[in-house]
């Protein structure tokens, strides 16, 4: 922000700690499949073949700009840690403290200025408070990548948010740095209950798929894990909304 002149725009990108769950789940499923298959090296051809078995059809359904093998290297087997992830709750206060104000984002999810008369001028603090409230309403979208259906979904409690952060951290530990016999973390009860309370039936089905996937991943049958993944049609069509650009403007 110090590099900007008043009225100047800055842009940052980040991976959202909550919204990375779908991506992290695909990585965990591959890690567990490798363990059950006796594949010790995730950089190996055997791991790549397992990834093709699991994810070929899913990957073919999206408008990808890179081949499957490149996605496997970048998204599935590259090491990552929870420490490198961020949230809007962390970033927005930093932007405000630096004398800047939220301007826009991609994906465009914030409703901070929607249906507001242009003469209603708000302070940066007021807009940022409204922005973070809007984030809670968009939480199911962040987690699944599925656009809002117009049906009512509850706001996530602090318990739900903490359960997601802890869960993502546990997955990060499980998939770093190598395949091991460590126990797969259990799908959080608080998150399971939250998704079940959503009125959107697609969110409910996504939730059921997630619960089945983690139950299967905590077992010791490769065939059951592969069959369960194939049956999870809603999850397989989701990719989360984990990668974000934020634009901010330097205050006068």
Each language-model region and where it sits:
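Short, low-complexity, polar/charged sequence segments that are solvent-exposed and flexible
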Residues: 4, 29-33, 123-124
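Conserved class I S-adenosyl-L-methionine
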Residues: 9-57
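Rossmann-like AdoMet/SAM-dependent catalytic core
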Residues: 63-249
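A short glycine-rich, Lys/Arg-flanked "PGG" loop and its adjoining helix->strand segment in the class I
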Residues: 1-9
